[in-house]
């Protein structure tokens, strides 16, 4: 049984979150949680929270056994980008792009 959890509008760029997502794809859930716990990146905390939510969804909604679960799919899509202006010297201005992402984790007991 596949179970999904999503975090939409996560305040980190998709490029940065994908680095962390690639670390846990295909691993057992317990091993993935341990990997994320010791990964020193902001995105690791975001992905860990979504993974824990997927585990809880599988246990509560589908009655799955946690020991059998694996991360079957994990993907990160780009979310909306907030555009901001940073004043610079001599009356100029630069555009700052504050990127966001949509994190999706799918766990399965197969």
Curated annotation (Swiss-Prot):
GO MF assignments: rRNA binding; structural constituent of ribosome
Keywords, alphabetical: Ribonucleoprotein, Ribosomal protein, RNA-binding, rRNA-binding
PROSITE patterns: RIBOSOMAL_L22
Gene3D superfamilies named among the record's database cross-references: Ribosomal protein L22/L17
Top-level taxon of the source organism: Bacteria
Family the UniProt entry places it in: Belongs to the universal ribosomal protein uL22 family.
Assembly mode: Part of the 50S ribosomal subunit.
Protein name: Large ribosomal subunit protein uL22
